[in-house]
């Protein structure tokens, strides 16, 4: 599919996707863990450590892919992505304010746990054929949740369908949210 060219820098699709996932997780972490409130898109950049963190993520070698400066120029890739990050965290904060959450990104423990389980139990190796989520937000204790999922998957008869059902129930009860990082429209 060729390399996406972003702000005149060539970068592989996979590398860019990984950056987006880390950036989303980072913004969510600032919002959830560090209690940063972003009332509008610009606030993400006004918060120095969020801005610095995002710029560190969107860097390939010595190439700075995104620079986040104010005012945000509309219709630029930066504008599109900041808006996406903003809308995601806004929607989630609305649903989950005042709770105790842990945010896991693609490099995090829960992702490894669930991918490992699916691989071991159902012989599905690639994360994307069974597409869970790019980021998980877990309410309460991650280890208790993992234990619960693990014990419900013990025994022989379980199918991936049952795991999905369980994850869906957890989602309905707002104990676990999986976020997929497709761009969120304005």
List each language-model region with its residue ranges.
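Short, positively charged
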Residues: 2-186
């Amino acid at each position: 599919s060729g390399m996406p060219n972003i702000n005149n820098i060539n970068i592989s699709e996979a590398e860019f996707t990984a950056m987006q996932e880390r950036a989303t997780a980072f913004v969510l972490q600032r919002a959830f863990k560090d209690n940063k409130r972003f009332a509008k898109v610009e606030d993400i950049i006004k918060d120095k450590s969020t801005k610095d963190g995002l710029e560190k993520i969107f860097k390939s070698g010595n190439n700075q892919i995104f620079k986040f400066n104010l005012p945000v120029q509309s219709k630029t890739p930066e504008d599109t992505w900041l808006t996406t990050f903003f809308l995601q965290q806004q929607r989630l904060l609305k649903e989950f304010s005042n709770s105790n959450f842990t945010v896991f990104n693609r490099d995090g423990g829960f992702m490894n746990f669930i991918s490992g389980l699916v691989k071991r139990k159902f012989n599905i190796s690639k994360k994307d054929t069974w597409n869970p989520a790019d980021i998980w937000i877990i309410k309460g204790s991650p280890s208790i949740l993992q234990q619960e999922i693990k014990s419900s998957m013990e025994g022989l008869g379980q199918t991936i369908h049952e795991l999905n059902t369980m994850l869906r129930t957890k989602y309905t009860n707002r104990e676990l949210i999986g976020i997929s990082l497709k761009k969120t429209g304005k």
